[in-house]
Amino acid sequence: MYYASTCMDHEIVEKKYKLGLNVTDNYKVRYNISLISQIFEGRCDYKNVVRLSLPKSLDLYKTGSNHYAYTLEVNMINVEKIYKLDNFEDVKELIDLGADINEAIKNIIIVNNIDSLKYLLEKGANIDLIDSYLAKMGNIDIFEFLFVKKCPMNKFLPIAVEYGHLNLVKFLVEKGVYVDFIDRTKYTFSEYTPLVAACSAGHIKIVEYLIEKGANYKSSYGVYLAAEKGHYDIVKFLIDKGTDLEKYGLRSLNEVIKKGHFDIMKLFINSGLEIDYDYYIYKAGLRGHTDIVKYLVMMQMSKQIQKI
């Protein structure tokens, strides 16, 4: 039996495979030869699993001595079954066929279904293996269940923040997740706190909430990322709150001038940041930002007049 994992819409997969289209031209797939136990290995967000019949005369190419993954340009002659991984009965059938429960529980599409999640845990799957990207689904009911089951919750906070799920963020913080938690298994950058993630993604309500709950904003890298990505409201909020611009102020200003974020540039200038006007006029001119050049020249002249 041949299996392929895919993220494509199952109806499109079924239609095009049955037409005999070349799978490698249309989809990113992974073939498993009689190894259903390995079907969930790899990505954590496969949406369906397709069971295919291939020509018997096909000469398969093995990609590695210890691997059972195959990539060939072949034409499908039939789609025997499509297992939708958000469907409990389909997941149960795959497990009954021999799919690895500890690989299955890593799939966020599967565990976002409460029945499938309960079934895997009943079968003995390791709850610690649930991928942190489950938080991008924002399903509070799932996380309430996981909390009761004593699943480690810290790793979900940065992802919930990144995807803008304020209610889930509140739930996690209220359940004791450290507001400045850094998931070092995914982020090697030592300052990528949930607040930094919220600033980068532009989620002002989450920024406000995290700071209210004690997140460190004074010397946060978040002001730089918010400035770089043009999130005016977040930059203004952080500056008004008194974030320390000594560490990231000039670096942020350099980025906003490079990208032409005029209004954000004014926030930094008006904050009292000491800058080299000649340098930034030159940088803005190189990028063709004439509005910024004019403003900086005006500010420079004003400063010079004040010194007279």
UniProtKB/Swiss-Prot annotation:
Q: Which InterPro entries match?
A: Ankyrin-EF-hand (IPR052801), Ankyrin_rpt (IPR002110), Ankyrin_rpt-contain_sf (IPR036770)
Q: Name one Pfam family in it.
A: Ank_2
Which PROSITE patterns does this chain map to?
A: ANK_REP_REGION, ANK_REPEAT
**SMART domains per the UniProt record, alphabetical:** ANK
The alphabetized UniProt keywords are:
ANK repeat, Repeat
Map the ANK repeats onto residue numbers. Answer: 100-129, 152-181, 190-217, 218-247, 249-277, 279-305
Is Ligase set as a keyword in this record?
no
Q: Could you tell me what this protein is called?
A: Putative ankyrin repeat protein R835
